[in-house]
C-alpha cells in the first residue's frame, strides 16, 4: 500500500466493535471522554501504559529532531500494537488534529508512516478534528456530541483543579482522589442516561462538586503554589512531563494546572482564520 493511501474507518468496522486506541494526555478528562465515546458505540481505550519502552518505540519510528510529544504519542500507540493484547485486524487508532500551525497537525501522517514501516498500514487511523481535515464514515463528530464534549471538558477542568487544590492539604490521604473517582462514576452514569450536559444541569452539578471538595478536612497550612504551563501535551501528560505533578506533591507543593477549556478558543481561531481566508483543507 502506498503511503499516500488512507485506510478509512468504516461503519462496518464500528459495527464489528473495533478497539480504538488513543494516547493518554489529561488522565481525569480522558477517563470521562472514554465513557462519552462508549455512549455513542465507540470502543475507545485510552492507553494507560508507562515506561521507557514507550520512548524506545517512538525513537524507532519518529526522527529525534521531531518534537518529544510526537515521539511519545506515536511510541505509546506502537507499543500497544506490539503488546500482543489486541487483534490488529480489529484495531484502529485515533489522534487529534487541530489544523493549526503546530506540527501536531502532522502527527497523524507520522503515525501512518510508522505503521507502514512496520507492515501495519492496514490499521485505520482516525483524525479527531472539527476542521474537516479528514472524514470517516464510521466516525462522526455530531453537534450533540461536541456539546457533550464541552461539558466533559468543564467537568474535567473542575475535578482536576479541585483535586490539585485539595490534595496537598487533605488530612486523610486519598480523600480528594476518591472524590474524583466517585464523581467520574456519577457523571458517567448521568451521561449514559443523556443527563448532565445541559447548562441548567451543569449550573447545579458544578457547585455540588465544589461543595464536596470544600468539605474535605484539610490542615490549613500554607504551601508553595507552582503553576505549570507550556506545550499542551507536556503540560498535562504524566509521561510527557515525567510525573511533574507527583514530583511537586512530593516536594510539599500545591500544583496549579490551567484547564483544557482555555485551549478551545485557540482551535476555534484556527478554524475561523481558514474560513475567513477561504482556504480549503481538501
Residue ranges and their predicted role:
Residues 1-275, 280:
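An N-terminal assembly and electron-transfer interface module characteristic of large anaerobic redox
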Amino acid at each position: 500500500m502506498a503511503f499516500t493511501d488512507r485506510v478509512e474507518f468504516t461503519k462496518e468496522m464500528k459495527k464489528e466493535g473495533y478497539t480504538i486506541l488513543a494516547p493518554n494526555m489529561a488522565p481525569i478528562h480522558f477517563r470521562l471522554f472514554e465513557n462519552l465515546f462508549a455512549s455513542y458505540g465507540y470502543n475507545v481505550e485510552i492507553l494507560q501504559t508507562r515506561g521507557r519502552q514507550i520512548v524506545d518505540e517512538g525513537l524507532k519510528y519518529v526522527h529525534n529532531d521531531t518534537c518529544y510529544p510526537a515521539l511519545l504519542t506515536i511510541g505509546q500507540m506502537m507499543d500497544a500494537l506490539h503488546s500482543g493484547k489486541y487483534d490488529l485486524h480489529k484495531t484502529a487508532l485515533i489522534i487529534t488534529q487541530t489544523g493549526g500551525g503546530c506540527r501536531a497537525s502532522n502527527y497523524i501522517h507520522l503515525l501512518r508512516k510508522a505503521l507502514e514501516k512496520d507492515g501495519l498500514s492496514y490499521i485505520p487511523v482516525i483524525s479527531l478534528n472539527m476542521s474537516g481535515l479528514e472524514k470517516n464514515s464510521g466516525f462522526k463528530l455530531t453537534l450533540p456530541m461536541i456539546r457533550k464534549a464541552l461539558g466533559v471538558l468543564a467537568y474535567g477542568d473542575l475535578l482536576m483543579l479541585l483535586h490539585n487544590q485539595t490534595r496537598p492539604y487533605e488530612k486523610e490521604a486519598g480523600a480528594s482522589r476518591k472524590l474524583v473517582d466517585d464523581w467520574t462514576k456519577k457523571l458517567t452514569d448521568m451521561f449514559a442516561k443523556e443527563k448532565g450536559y445541559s447548562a441548567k444541569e451543569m449550573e447545579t452539578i458544578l457547585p455540588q462538586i465544589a461543595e464536596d471538595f470544600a468539605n474535605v478536612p484539610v490542615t490549613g497550612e500554607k504551601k508553595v503554589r507552582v503553576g505549570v504551563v507550556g506545550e499542551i501535551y507536556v503540560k498535562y501528560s504524566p509521561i510527557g512531563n515525567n510525573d511533574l505533578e507527583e514530583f511537586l506533591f512530593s516536594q510539599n507543593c500545591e500544583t496549579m494546572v490551567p484547564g483544557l477549556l482555555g485551549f478551545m478558543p485557540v482551535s476555534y481561531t484556527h478554524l475561523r482564520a481558514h474560513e475567513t481566508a477561504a482556504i480549503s483543507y481538501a
